[in-house]
């Protein structure tokens, strides 16, 4: 439940829910599990801000354990599609698809707060009981394609080659803000708003 915000304007008092008020300042929140309805909302906000001013920066604050690959990729594809630069700030956790979104920000403008964490790993998948063997082979093939696609995105976003990414995503690979910076997924660590970030 979001608190309401009341502002005094030239037209009188105006009331907003908090995300709508943040949107006025070109701030987008990616909070919680990445799923279709959340992704639709994020994509709509990005397209709205792009239509308002395609040259002005958008700030995206991320705290997400990940979720649906297709929902997450709809967000990252939109981030790359629009002309407006998207700055990403990880607060709390970016895991799984959350890391794909966070690393898809404008290079040079991808940040973490000092106590935030990053987690990369393979996409999850599995067959439902009773699934035919041929269907299981199709699922396995699709999972391999998805893994390869996500690994390429991570390699392009970092200072690491595809072989290193593939090895590190074989199991859960946790990183602190400092480790994420050294890995190349982010460009700086923010400790105070308005102050210069810690960089390499």
UniProtKB/Swiss-Prot annotation:
Signal peptide: none
Subcellular location: Cytoplasm
Cross-referenced InterPro entries: ClpP (IPR001907), ClpP/crotonase-like_dom_sf (IPR029045), ClpP/TepA (IPR023562), ClpP_His_AS (IPR033135), ClpP_Ser_AS (IPR018215)
Main location as per UniProt: cytoplasm
GO biological process: one example: protein quality control for misfolded or incompletely synthesized proteins
Entry-linked SUPFAM superfamilies: ClpP/crotonase (SSF52096)
PROSITE patterns listed in its UniProt record: CLP_PROTEASE_HIS, CLP_PROTEASE_SER
Catalysed reactions, semicolon-separated: Hydrolysis of proteins to small peptides in the presence of ATP and magnesium. alpha-casein is the usual test substrate. In the absence of ATP, only oligopeptides shorter than five residues are hydrolyzed (such as succinyl-Leu-Tyr-|-NHMec, and Leu-Tyr-Leu-|-Tyr-Trp, in which cleavage of the -Tyr-|-Leu- and -Tyr-|-Trp bonds also occurs)
Assembly and binders: Fourteen ClpP subunits assemble into 2 heptameric rings which stack back to back to give a disk-like structure with a central cavity, resembling the structure of eukaryotic proteasomes.
Protein family according to the UniProt entry: Belongs to the peptidase S14 family.
Protein name: ATP-dependent Clp protease proteolytic subunit
Organism: Leuconostoc citreum (strain KM20)
Origin organism lineage: Bacteria, Bacillati, Bacillota, Bacilli, Lactobacillales
